[in-house]
């Protein structure tokens, strides 16, 4: 994958593709990023991150993906490292530019607090 990202960064034709993709997804990506920022915690180098990392990654994913079968991509990292944010941005790019159907799921969608788990266990133990 590193070689693909390097190729995309160096190739003039791929730079044009990257720019074309960026122009199409920029508004949606920046709007999403803005919704995630707080006054104290602003994202740095937003456009650079999208153009230099996310778009090349999405080109790689799109080459691997088959519209007829599911293709799974996983992101791992500790709490608060940006997995949900990055996966949301990848989804925006893959759906808006590459016209792929994307289903994003987060482990946070399944997480319950200790109190919630205890409550649920009481219901199931009755």
Please provide the spans of the model-predicted regions:
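Charged, amphipathic alpha-helical linker segments immediately N-terminal to NTP-binding catalytic cores
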Residues: 1-52
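Conserved nucleotide-sensing/catalytic segment adjacent to the nucleotide-binding pocket
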Residues: 41-47, 103-106, 110-126
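Phosphate-binding P-loop
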Residues: 63-70
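Hydrophobic anchor at the beta1->P-loop junction of P-loop NTPases
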Residues: 73-75
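P-loop (Walker A) phosphate-binding loop of NTP-binding proteins
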Residues: 78
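ATP-binding Walker
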Residues: 81
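Walker A/P-loop
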Residues: 84
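Post-Walker A helix-loop "phosphate-sensing" segment adjacent to the P-loop in P-loop NTPases
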Residues: 92-103
